[in-house]
C-alpha cells in the first residue's frame, strides 16, 4: 500500500483453489515495515483454511521492542502455517547459513523430503552458542537501535522520505535512480542495497557500527549538497 505495507485484504481476494502457498515476510524486506500482530493473525487464520501460509520472521528479533508476537502460536493451535527464523541477522551468523522452521509434523516431514543436505556441526554448535549468549543479543539490539535512530535523524535533516523500520536497515527515497546513487556511494567506499523494483529511486541501507554509519551520513550530505 502507500505506506509500503502488505495489503492483506487484496492478497486475500487473490487467493484461489490454485494458490499453493501465500508468503508473508514480517517485518518486511526491503521496506522494513511491519503488519500489526492482530491484523496478521486474523489474516493467517483465515487464509490458512484455504492454503498454506508461510510467515518469514527473519527480522522478528528486531521487532521485539515493538511488541510484535510471533505467529508460532498459530502453529501450536493447528493452523496450516509455516514460520521461519534465521541466525543470519541479530545473531551475526550470516556466513554460517543456519536457520529453522516451525510447522506441524506432517508439513515438516514433506519439507524434509526436499532437503538437499543436513546442517553441518559447525553451524549447529555456533547457533546454539549464539542463542545462549543473551548479553550479545541485547548488545546487538541496542547497537542496532542506535544506528536506526541516527538514520531517522539524518533523513529528517535532509528532508528525505523514509519508512520507520522494524529491522536492521532503513528504506529511504533517494530521489534519483538507485544505480546512480549506488555508483556515487561506491566511489566513496560505501556499498548500498541493490535495486528493488519498482522502487528504483529508493535505497535500503543497513545498520552497522555507529562510526561507519556516521561516515555514510557524511557522504549522503555531500551527495545532496
Ranges and model annotations:
Residues 95, 166-167, 198-201:
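Short acidic/glycine-enriched loop/turn segments that link adjacent beta-strands
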Residues 21-27, 53-57, 163-165:
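Short beta-strands and strand-loop turn motifs
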Residues 145, 155-188, 207:
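Conserved PLP-binding catalytic core of the aspartate aminotransferase-like
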Residues 80-156, 160-163:
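PLP-dependent aminotransferase class I/II
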Residues 55, 83, 119, 192-194:
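Hydrophobic residues in well-ordered beta-strands that form the structural core
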Residues 38, 42, 183-188, 192, ...:
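PLP-dependent enzyme catalytic core of the Aspartate aminotransferase-like
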Residues 5-18, 30-53, 57-90:
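Active-site pre-lysine segment of PLP-dependent enzymes
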Amino acid at each position: 500500500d502507500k505506506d509500503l505495507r502488505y495489503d492483506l485484504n487484496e492478497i486475500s481476494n487473490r487467493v484461489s483453489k490454485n494458490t499453493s502457498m501465500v508468503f508473508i515476510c514480517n517485518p518486511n524486506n526491503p521496506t522494513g515495515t511491519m503488519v500489526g500482530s492482530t491484523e496478521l493473525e486474523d489474516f493467517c487464520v483465515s487464509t490458512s483454511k484455504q492454503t498454506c501460509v508461510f510467515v518469514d520472521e527473519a527480522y522478528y528479533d528486531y521487532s521485539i521492542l515493538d511488541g510484535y508476537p510471533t505467529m508460532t502460536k498459530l502453529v501450536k493451535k493447528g493452523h496450516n502455517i509455516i514460520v521461519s527464523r534465521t541466525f543470519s541477522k541479530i545473531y551475526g551468523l550470516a556466513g554460517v547459513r543456519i536457520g529453522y522452521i516451525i510447522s506441524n509434523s506432517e508439513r515438516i516431514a514433506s519439507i524434509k523430503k526436499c532437503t538437499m543436505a543436513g546442517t553441518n556441526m559447525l553451524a549447529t554448535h555456533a547457533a546454539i552458542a549464539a542463542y545462549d549468549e543473551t548479553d550479545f543479543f541485547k548488545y546487538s539490539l541496542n547497537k542496532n537501535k542506535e544506528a536506526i535512530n541516527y538514520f531517522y535523524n539524518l533523513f529528517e535533516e535532509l528532508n528525505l522520505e523514509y519508512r520507520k523500520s522494524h529491522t536492521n536497515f532503513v528504506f529511504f527515497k533517494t530521489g534519483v535512480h538507485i544505480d546512480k546513487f549506488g555508483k556515487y556511494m561506491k566511489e566513496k567506499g560505501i556499498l548500498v542495497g541493490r535495486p528493488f523494483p519498482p522502487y528504483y529511486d529508493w535505497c535500503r541501507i543497513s545498520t552497522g557500527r555507529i562510526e561507519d554509519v556516521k561516515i555514510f551520513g557524511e557522504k549522503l550530505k555531500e551527495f545532496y549538497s
